Amino acid sequence: MHDFFPGLIVGAIILKVAIIAPTMFKTLDSSNFGKAIRPLWPKFFAMVVVLSIFSLITVYLHSDLSVYHMIIAVSSIVLAAICYVIIPATNRATDNGDHKTFKILHRISVSFTVILLILNIAFPVSYTHLTLPTSSWV
């Protein structure tokens, strides 16, 4: 069960980035692409935040998991939340024709999404002897 939520995150990223976005880009003109994709990204990153929170809860409840799992779950929450928060600024830069700002924000979003993918792929292989501390009085 530990790997369930990271697996969902990996699957969602692959589906969105490798299938949905390219298909929309190829089939819609730029105006309709923007209208269609804008409502999807906030939902996508919000979903990744929620899945990452569930992953963190799972890690917390299973003391046999390592500190690395905790780091992956917390990092996933932070990175997805940052991507979510910068969406309005990215859209504003696009609307205002500010290509430089758009390029920077888009690069951050893409980079963080790739890091999210790598971290969550690494989740099942990061079992080590470095385990989370458990309370001695429970």
Predicted segments, located by residue:
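Mid-chain, well-packed structural core segment of small domains
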Residues: 65-93
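Interfacial loop at the N-terminal end of multi-pass membrane proteins
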Residues: 1-55, 59, 99
